[in-house]
């Protein structure tokens, strides 16, 4: 009887395993081939850190040009409780093949048919958050929104999340594509209340002489200064209405007794102003004391937007060196492409299109330096100009001879060895064994700009 029970348990377990295996097979996922290992740690793309107060909405204008909108109650602890104490949010953006290379991000994967493919990227970022040193989770009811800066408005790209536990890419559908301008971002900044003004030529006062209780008495010591600098209103009106627009501006409406000339203005928007210098000075001091924090916050955000656009212009120029497409030139300084999505989990988010390796040439590579000495290279990659992708190779190298290609890797002592566009043009072989005579930089390069200058600005 015991043997029978054991047999039933075994059969039941095998059945469960079989069902689970079929279920997993029915939902294939692309498998990443490499771990996140930066090849040159000192040149890795560093994440920027922001301190978030989870009890209020926060908008971050990142230096890349991306915009991160964090709603209140966006973070959960490991028990699923809403976090209310400060959260450290880290964000970094990857825009071109060198960014991707230096971060060590896997771009090769295998699809459900066993085919080796490579991601072409329209933008990628990593976002993480922690509270008191512990990783936090996304609140599915209050998701963070990222307007990720991109250099392509092509709809062929899909969204993928990298699962750090299984090292697999999960496809999550499409993002929303839109454009943004510097002017639009600045206009979305909150307005500080307008400071007190000194009364000018067309400033006026208002009084209520028709009612025993003066309904305009709160304005008896101030003058209204028309914003447009033009004369407004007239005497002996039936009524005067003052509406506080809540931003330091007031709308004053003059109600006439009868017909008035068409040239007379009955409504105007005004600032509050003072003719008495002592009153003006006092009002200005009170204003600065009351709104100093708000004004500083707005100016800091304005500065962040200005810096982000300046940095965006730099990244556009770098991207153009990789892509060399005419439409990219039109982005500089005028508009930027944004791809909007919600964050479902923290980690790496990729806006990509899977495609095959370059075709036209397939060679078995070995490497030597300019003196013919054999090189044992690691982290060997190829970039095809015009495609925002990174092709990682060991010995077999695929490339399109009709394209402009750059190949590079690292020597055993971490020096940059590279094969230029001109070197590829001189290469006649399309198959078989090929010895690549690499240019080796004399010193170890440790910064992004140094590597960029050698590979793409020389």
Residue ranges and their predicted role:
Residues 15-18:
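C-terminal motif of bacterial Sec signal peptides marking the signal peptidase cleavage site
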Residues 20-23, 227, 341:
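Pro/Ser/Thr/Gly-rich intrinsically disordered low-complexity regions
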Residues 329-357, 417-458:
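Extracellular beta-sheet/turn segments enriched in Thr/Pro/Gly and aliphatic residues
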Residues 359-372, 379:
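A short, amphipathic beta-strand motif
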Residues 182-322:
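Long intrinsically disordered, low-complexity regions that are acidic and Ser/Thr-rich
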Residues 46, 70-71, 112-114, 129-194, ...:
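Proteolytic-maturation and junctional protease-sensitive modules
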Residues 23-68, 72-78, 83, 92-158, ...:
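Proteolytic processing hotspots in large secreted/extracellular or virion-associated proteins
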Residues 1-6, 20-21:
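Positively charged n-region of N-terminal signal peptides that target proteins for export
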């Amino acid at each position: 009887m015991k043997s029978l029970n054991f047999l039933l348990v075994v059969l039941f377990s095998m059945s469960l395993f079989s069902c689970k295996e079929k279920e997993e097979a029915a939902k294939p996922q692309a498998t990443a081939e490499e771990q996140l290992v930066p090849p040159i740690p000192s040149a890795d793309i560093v994440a920027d850190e922001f301190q978030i107060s989870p009890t209020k909405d926060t908008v971050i204008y990142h230096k890349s040009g991306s915009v991160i909108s964090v709603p209140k109650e966006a973070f959960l602890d490991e028990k699923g409780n809403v976090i209310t104490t400060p959260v450290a949010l880290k964000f970094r953006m990857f825009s071109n093949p060198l960014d991707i290379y230096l971060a060590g991000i896997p771009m090769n994967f295998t699809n459900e048919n066993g085919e080796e493919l490579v991601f072409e990227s329209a933008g990628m970022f990593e976002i993480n958050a922690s509270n008191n040193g512990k990783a936090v989770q996304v609140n599915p009811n209050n998701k963070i929104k990222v307007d990720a800066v991109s250099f392509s408005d092509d709809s062929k790209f899909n969204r993928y999340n990298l699962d750090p536990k299984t090292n697999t890419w999960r496809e999550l559908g499409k993002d929303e594509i839109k454009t943004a301008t510097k002017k639009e971002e600045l206009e979305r900044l909150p307005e500080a209340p307008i400071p007190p003004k000194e009364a000018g030529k067309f400033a006026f006062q208002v009084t209520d002489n028709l009612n025993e209780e003066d309904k305009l008495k709160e304005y008896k010591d101030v003058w209204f200064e028309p914003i447009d600098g033009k004369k407004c209103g007239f005497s002996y009106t039936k009524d005067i209405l003052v509406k506080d627009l809540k931003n330091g501006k007031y709308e004053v409406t003059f109600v006439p007794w009868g017909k008035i000339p068409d040239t007379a203005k009955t409504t105007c928007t005004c600032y509050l102003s003072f003719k008495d210098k002592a009153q003006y000075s006092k009002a200005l001091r009170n204003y600065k004391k009351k709104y100093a924090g708000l004004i500083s916050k707005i100016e800091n955000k304005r500065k962040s937007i200005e810096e982000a656009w300046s940095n965006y212009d730099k990244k556009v120029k770098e991207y153009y060196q990789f892509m060399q497409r005419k439409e990219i030139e039109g982005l500089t300084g005028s508009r930027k492409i944004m791809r909007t999505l919600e964050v479902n989990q923290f980690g790496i988010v990729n806006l990509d299109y899977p495609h095959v390796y370059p075709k036209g040439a397939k060679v078995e590579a070995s490497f030597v330096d300019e003196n013919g000495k054999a090189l044992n290279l690691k982290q060997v990659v190829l970039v095809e100009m015009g495609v925002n992708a990174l092709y990682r190779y060991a010995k077999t190298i695929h490339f399109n001879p009709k394209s402009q290609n750059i190949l590079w890797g690292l020597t055993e002592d971490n020096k940059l060895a590279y094969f230029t566009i001109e070197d590829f043009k001189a290469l006649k072989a399309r198959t078989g064994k090929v010895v690549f005579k690499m240019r080796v930089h004399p010193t170890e390069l440790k910064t992004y700009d140094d590597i960029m200058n050698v590979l793409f600005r020389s």
